[in-house]
């Protein structure tokens, strides 16, 4: 009887450990993707300055100056924030 209970316990551990490890891997992957997304977002506004604002019609307008970049525009910051920003 004790041998059967011990064997069931070992089987239970073998089943639980791999599934909990997979959940940790998924969380680590999500954190890595989020960090990469916000890092890219921050890089796109570096070296940019100007007056960029949302008009009454909802469009972003203003003047932007990007040092070291040939293309600079005033546009939506990103879909989580409804503001406007200069991007290069």
Swiss-Prot record:
Signal peptide: 1-21
Annotated source species: Conus caracteristicus (Characteristic cone)
Compartmental location: Secreted
Post-translational modification: Contains 5 disulfide bonds.
Gene Ontology cellular component terms for the protein in this record: extracellular region
Similarity annotation: Belongs to the conotoxin S superfamily.
Predominant location: secreted
Protein name (record): Conotoxin Ca8a
GO molecular function terms attached to this record: toxin activity
Keyword terms of this UniProt record: Disulfide bond, Neurotoxin, Secreted, Signal, Toxin
Segments passing through the bilayer: none
Tissue expression from the record: Expressed by the venom duct.
Superkingdom field: Eukaryota
Propeptide stretch(es), residue numbers: 22-46
Entry text on domains: The cysteine framework is VIII (C-C-C-C-C-C-C-C-C-C).
């Amino acid at each position: 009887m004790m041998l059967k209970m011990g064997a069931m316990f070992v089987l239970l551990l073998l089943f639980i450990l791999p599934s909990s490890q997979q959940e940790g891997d998924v969380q680590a992957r999500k954190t890595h993707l989020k960090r990469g997304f916000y890092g890219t977002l921050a890089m796109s506004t570096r070296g940019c300055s100007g007056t960029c604002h949302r008009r009454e019609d909802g469009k972003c307008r203003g003047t932007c100056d990007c040092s070291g970049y040939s293309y600079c525009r005033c546009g939506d910051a990103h879909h989580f924030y409804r503001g406007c920003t200069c991007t290069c």
